[in-house]
Amino acid sequence: MARVKRGVTAHAKHKKVLKQAEGFYGRRKNTIRAAKAAVDRSKQYAYRDRKNRKRTFRALWIQRINAAVRAEGLTYGRFIDGLSKAGIEVDRKVLSDIAIYEAEAFSALVASAKKALEYLKDTTPNAFEGAVK
């Protein structure tokens, strides 16, 4: 078998790593060992933070909805409960956008949630009514 010299492949791999380390500070951008470690770590952070981004955005949407709903005189939890009882299925991202950009439509959603909560309050018997005398 012919002898295979690894210079070409090694150089290509090194170039690839150094290309990914562009913009890094200090030795991490131009020495292979430091660049490889930094690139590996950056990939781990990127993987982790792709998961965290979903949590962060959900929390942001909930905060925005909560602020808009409290202006209407309701809490976030009661609002979500009212929407589910009214049979309205809208995710939090869309609710957040509606609250920001379409205030009238959001007020209508809040009104329908309040209506569903009031209707159920009137029709559901109190569990403690018969027990306490």
UniProtKB/Swiss-Prot annotation:
It holds the Pfam family Ribosomal_L20. Belongs to the bacterial ribosomal protein bL20 family. PANTHER family: 39S RIBOSOMAL PROTEIN L20. Keywords: Ribonucleoprotein, Ribosomal protein, RNA-binding, rRNA-binding. It comes from the Bacteria. One of its GO terms (cellular component) is ribosome. This is Large ribosomal subunit protein bL20. GO terms for molecular function: rRNA binding; structural constituent of ribosome. GO terms for biological process: ribosomal large subunit assembly; translation. Binds directly to 23S ribosomal RNA and is necessary for the in vitro assembly process of the 50S ribosomal subunit. It is not involved in the protein synthesizing functions of that subunit. InterPro entries: Ribosomal_bL20, RIBOSOMAL_L20_CS, Ribosomal_protein_bL20_C.
